[in-house]
Swiss-Prot record:
Protein residues bound to beta-alanine: Q61
Keyword NAD: no
GO cellular component, one term: cytosol
Binding of (R)-pantoate, residues: Q61, Q154
Full protein name: Pantothenate synthetase
GO terms, molecular function: ATP binding; pantoate-beta-alanine ligase activity
Alphabetized UniProt keyword annotations: ATP-binding, Cytoplasm, Ligase, Nucleotide-binding, Pantothenate biosynthesis
Assembly and oligomerization: Homodimer.
NCBIfam families: cyt_tran_rel, panC
Enzymatic reactions: (R)-pantoate + beta-alanine + ATP = (R)-pantothenate + AMP + diphosphate + H(+)
Active site: H37
Pathway recorded for this protein: Cofactor biosynthesis; (R)-pantothenate biosynthesis; (R)-pantothenate from (R)-pantoate and beta-alanine: step 1/1
Cited function: Catalyzes the condensation of pantoate with beta-alanine in an ATP-dependent reaction via a pantoyl-adenylate intermediate.
Amino acid sequence: MIVCKIPEEVLDQVRLWKAQGKRIGFVPTMGFLHEGHAYLFEECISKADKTVVSIFVNPAQFNDPEDYAKYPVNTEGDLKLCESKKVDLVFLPDKETIYPDGIPDIVLKIPNLMKSLCAVSRPGHFEGVLLVISRLFHFVQPDFAFFGKKDYQQYLLIREFCNTLAFPIEVIGCETVRSSQGLALSSRNSRLSETEKEESLLIYRSLKLGENQIFSGIKNPLLVKEIMKDVLDSSSKIRLDYLEILNADTLDPLEVLEGEILLAIAAFIGPVRLIDNLTLSVPIS
């Protein structure tokens, strides 16, 4: 496994592979890797000839400096996981490498997909995501890029970003990996106590209840949201950020629960903010 810390080394290796006719797959991460990331690596390896993983905690996407400071780091463990999963190259830049002149004063937006969910509750977050992704794509020049659908809005934004700017990259969304009890795997879970982990299971329980209500024939989104919210309100440890039912393609509000549907929740368990979602396909009557 090759480990690179500067973009020129990555570009040189990628160009060599491409000259050999190899297709490049890319999984950008912020490190503290877990089995959810490992699944992305496996999906990448199954489709691409060479797999590149980046590990970089991007300061531009944190609207809370304290959240950035507390983001967990385990570089040694991350490299071991990448090697065990047969990743070909790990790009391990520092902040000065990605932003040599500081974080630039440029704003990247896709307004139609940034009217709700995390774009509202974390202002500036996705602008920072699009900024770093544009730079990483420039450095790695992948044919495929893989993103987990736990961060569903991010996946949609990056896919639309590539389409709008005609990046020759196929953006592939991968299903959320969960614990045996249903908790979506996240690097932030490491900051939860055992009691908080138990309480956090209510997020998935709420989503599944919403799914069941919709498939039982309920068409009113407000009614389903109230039923879902009751589950979360049963815990004094959960502070709801948002609970939304939207069109899964456009993120527009729904008046009738038909077609492609996204159920999305963000909530604080103690000091830790967790997100999760389900997507459903309901026949249009």
